[in-house]
């Protein structure tokens, strides 16, 4: 072995051995407990970033530790390969999305392999491959048969210049990102999945999951189970009687209704706008806004009076109807009751347009004022009804019950449970996605593609130009025959939401070569024992994958109803930011590698200059690594300079997995320095370590006993920390071990070999290359087998036994020294030793002991 640690040589040698042995290819084994750990599959954007490195290293550490502990472990990998970024890159570069995607996959796969990850590449999938998305199509058709998938009109963002549908993120300040045209809302037919059918189960099953509480709460809020009242305001229009239906969780405030607001797309709005250009113009303006709920929440609230009124169902009073841009047709009934006295949004709307505000609940000790909104106005818990006739004095629950009963008696409505969750619209008017397997026949209508004709293959040679869907222009794809009548027909050109692709890939990993969607192997591996990914996926991906799993279960494909038992949301990787700002306020961001920072005498940054010109740049603070802030660190540069093990060690040591990690060049250098020490000790003591000298534990000297006691004590803590996923303290434990071994004076070769072997095994899951090569070079592999499957070291409890223990010695309650006594010393022997100790003589001022307090195993206090 080399005297000097050369990461490139060490890692090439270790990876060569692993490839030759096909070390990570995994099969089902009923004789072992299984552990299936999955990192959320990446989008093949071009290069790995440090967030990827951290995620996959956490997974890899878990895999290796559990494999050493006798588990049948599996770590697969794949590519979430469909999606809009590929189309955008294709337009920018004039190449098909397929080429861009596959090139990126090749490069990123090479990066992963250079990290030494324990991935079973025989299970690799790419969601853009027909053998994968065939099963998206197959399950979609099964859902169509069961009524879980259905078609209805939905609202989309329409760019009138590019003649294309835009995703919410492509609408910038109400305009198309490419054309700059004002975006319109359009109603088009789309396919939906009835996720609402599973709302109760999705909510209730959260209780049994080992997921972060924060994620569970986010899902609970997204599902949004509400108990309230659904009722209608009666009206008559053109001789027809009807109800304007609303849902409210605050029926206790019904006597405070002073207006109703309806969505621009509401059928009543359409009727009222007939012959009224001003109303129609406002409706058109609303339709030009984005359809994202977040956009609606933050935009300026606008409205227009329709001149029409409905009737309050309990008072008989006229209630004005307004059209509001903040009311979404896709939520609730597309109409809301306006209670400005007790709803902050309604309060602002009423103040803006001079609408009446009526107080109908009061809280003791609080004074109501129309001058400004106060938090208690909307508090249902500390208030009672006022100015509400027969409901005066009632608290929230009593008032809701009474109002609901009266509405029901009048035929206007009743109590209802509603959900914030809406059915999942899966149609996307994009090219690079799973084709929806439907054929449009002029005679037969919408016809599902027969199962034997799946997959409907997406052409991979098209280049989007930003004007419409390329599939609609591809005659080879578009034209087909109707499976029912044989007439000329057209294929559906919409593709599926890419969240479909990521909703079940972890199940396909378990049976990647199956000629069915999944098989018996899936029930062996699933559900995942550990899922790892960012908190940003807490709602959509994780909710959709739970729904998809439950559908697969109900169709008899699998026996489980949840995809993941446990979830780890790793923290973000942060780094410093630096920028310059021009006269227009535009900021140019500079990478930390291109900046020199000056510090004060306490190490705090006080200034920075750009290396290229020596001129100052502004310190922007620590933020998440991102392209927009140009503060990322290229993992490949790091690996090339320091080696993969250093990158792995730093990302595991710098912070616990679930917390944010602040990047530190000094920390990386420290990790590299530690690995050089590990190697140097092995190389410098290779003769003693490789000699395989034995020893008799009973006859060891004090130095050997002390070293073994320290190593096994630290091992016990490291093992505990591995189990609770606190890998930063595992690394700390390994550092303690190395210090103890390196500093041991008088330890014999046999004990050095034993304790260094423990260190290598403790470090191996975190830094597999250097430990694997040292294990082999020093002969441990000949004794225990390759480090890949070497047994995890067991704590030698006998080594932890001490003949003597050390007690704190106090005089009059103050610590004055330490007292060594035999482990099994009697109370009397301890008292005698304490009084005889020089510390007592020094601090007792010659006075005799009046009382001696002994706390077994801890301290002795002599009172004089």
From Swiss-Prot:
GO terms for cellular component: cytosol. This is Leucine--tRNA ligase. It catalyses: tRNA(Leu) + L-leucine + ATP = L-leucyl-tRNA(Leu) + AMP + diphosphate. The keyword ATP-binding applies. InterPro entries: aa-tRNA-synth_I_CS (IPR001412), aa-tRNA-synth_Ia (IPR002300), Leu-tRNA-ligase (IPR002302), Leu_tRNA-synth_edit (IPR025709), M/V/L/I-tRNA-synth_anticd-bd (IPR013155), Methionyl/Leucyl_tRNA_Synth (IPR015413), Rossmann-like_a/b/a_fold (IPR014729), tRNAsynth_Ia_anticodon-bd (IPR009080). Belongs to the class-I aminoacyl-tRNA synthetase family. Pfam families: Anticodon_1, tRNA-synt_1, tRNA-synt_1_2, tRNA-synt_1g. It comes from Burkholderia vietnamiensis (strain G4 / LMG 22486). The gene is leuS. The lineage of its organism: Bacteria, Pseudomonadati, Pseudomonadota, Betaproteobacteria, Burkholderiales. ATP binds at residue 627.
């Amino acid at each position: 072995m080399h005297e000097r640690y050369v990461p490139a040589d060490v890692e090439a040698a270790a990876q060569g051995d692993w490839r030759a042995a096909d070390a990570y290819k995994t099969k089902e084994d009923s004789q072992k407990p299984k552990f299936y750990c999955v990192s959320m599959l990446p989008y093949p954007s071009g290069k790995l970033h440090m967030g990827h490195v951290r995620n996959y290293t956490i997974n890899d550490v878990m895999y290796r530790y559990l494999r050493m502990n006798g588990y049948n472990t599996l770590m697969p990998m794949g590519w979430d390969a469909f999606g809009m970024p590929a189309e955008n890159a294709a337009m920018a570069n004039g190449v098909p999305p397929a080429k861009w995607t596959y090139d990126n996959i090749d490069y990123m796969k090479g990066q992963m392999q250079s990290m030494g990850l324990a991935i079973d590449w025989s299970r690799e999938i790419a969601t853009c491959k027909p053998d994968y998305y065939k099963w998206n199509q197959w399950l979609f058709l099964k859902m169509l048969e069961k009524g879980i998938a259905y078609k209805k009109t939905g609202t989309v963002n329409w760019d009138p210049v590019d003649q294309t549908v835009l995703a919410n993120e492509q609408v910038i300040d109400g305009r198309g990102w490419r054309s700059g045209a004002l975006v319109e809302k359009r109603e088009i037919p789309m396919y939906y999945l009835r996720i609402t059918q599973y709302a109760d189960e999705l909510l209730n099953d959260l209780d049994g999951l080992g997921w972060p509480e924060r994620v569970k709460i986010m899902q609970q809020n997204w599902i949004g189970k509400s108990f309230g009242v659904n009722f209608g305001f009666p009206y008559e229009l053109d001789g027809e009687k009807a109800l304007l239906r609303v849902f409210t969780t605050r029926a206790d405030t019904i006597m405070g209704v002073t207006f109703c607001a309806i969505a621009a797309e509401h059928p009543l709005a359409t009727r009222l706008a007939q012959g009224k250009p001003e109303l129609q113009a406002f409706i058109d303006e609303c339709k030009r806004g984005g359809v994202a709920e977040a956009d609606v929440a933050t935009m300026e609230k606008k409205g227009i009076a329709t001149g029409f009124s409905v009737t309050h169902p309990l008072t008989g009073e006229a209630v004005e109807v307004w059209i509001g841009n903040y009311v979404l047709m896709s939520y609730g009934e597309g109409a809301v009751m306006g209670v400005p006295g007790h709803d902050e949004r309604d309060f602002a709307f009423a103040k803006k347009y001079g609408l009446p505000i009526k107080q109908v609940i009061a809280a003791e000790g609080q004074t109501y004022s129309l001058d400004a909104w106060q938090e208690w106005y909307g508090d249902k818990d500390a208030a009672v009804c006022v100015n509400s006739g027969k409901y005066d004095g009632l608290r929230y629950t009593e008032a809701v019950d009474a109002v609901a009963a009266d509405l029901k008696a009048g035929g206007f409505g009743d109590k209802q449970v509603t959900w914030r969750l809406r059915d999942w619209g899966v149609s996307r008017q994009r090219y690079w996605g799973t084709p929806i397997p439907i054929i449009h026949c002029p005679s037969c209508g919408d016809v599902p593609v027969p199962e034997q004709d799946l997959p409907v293959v997406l052409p991979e040679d098209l280049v989007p130009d930003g004007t419409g869907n390329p599939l609609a222009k591809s005659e080879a794809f578009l034209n087909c025959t109707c499976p029912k009548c044989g007439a000329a027909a057209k294929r559906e050109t919409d593709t599926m939401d890419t969240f479909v692709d990521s909703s079940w890939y972890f199940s396909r990993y378990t049976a990647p070569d199956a000629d069915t969607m999944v098989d018996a192997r899936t029930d062996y591996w699933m559900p995942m024992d550990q899922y790892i990914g960012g908190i940003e996926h807490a709602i959509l991906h994780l909710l959709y994958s739970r729904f998809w799993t439950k559908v697969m279960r109900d169709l008899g494909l699998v026996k489980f109803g949840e995809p993941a038992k446990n979830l780890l949301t790793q923290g973000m990787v942060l780094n410093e930011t630096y920028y310059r700002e021009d006269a227009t306020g535009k900021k140019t961001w500079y990478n930390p590698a291109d900046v020199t920072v000056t510090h004060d005498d306490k190490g705090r940054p006080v200034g920075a200059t750009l290396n290229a010109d020596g001129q100052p740049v502004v310190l922007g603070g620590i933020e998440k690594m991102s392209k927009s802030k140009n503060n990322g660190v290229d993992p490949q540069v790091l690996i090339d300079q320091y080696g993969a093990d250093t990158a792995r060690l730093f990302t595991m040591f710098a912070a616990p997995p679930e917390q944010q990690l602040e990047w530190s060049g000094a920390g990386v250098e420290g990790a590299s320095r530690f690995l050089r020490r590990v190697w140097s000790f092995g190389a410098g003591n290779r003769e003693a370590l490789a000699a395989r000298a034995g020893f008799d534990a009973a006859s060891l000297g004090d130095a050997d006993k002390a070293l073994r006691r320290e190593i096994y004590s630290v091992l016990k803590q490291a093992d505990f920390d591995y189990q609770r996923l606190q890998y930063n303290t595992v690394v700390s434990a390994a550092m303690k071990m190395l210090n103890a071994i390196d500093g041991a004076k008088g330890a014999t070769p046999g004990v050095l070999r034993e304790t260094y072997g423990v260190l290598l095994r403790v470090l191996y899951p975190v830094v597999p290359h250097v430990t694997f090569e040292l294990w082999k070079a020093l002969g441990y592999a000949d004794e225990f087998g390759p480090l890949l499957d070497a047994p995890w070291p067991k704590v030698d409890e006998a080594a932890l036994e001490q003949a003597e223990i050390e007690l704190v010695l106090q005089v009059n309650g103050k610590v004055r020294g330490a007292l060594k006594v035999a482990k099994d010393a009697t109370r009397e022997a301890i008292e005698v030793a304490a009084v005889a100790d020089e510390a007592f003589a020094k601090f007792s001022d010659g006075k005799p002991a009046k009382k001696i307090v002994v706390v077994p195993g801890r301290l002795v206090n002599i009172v004089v």
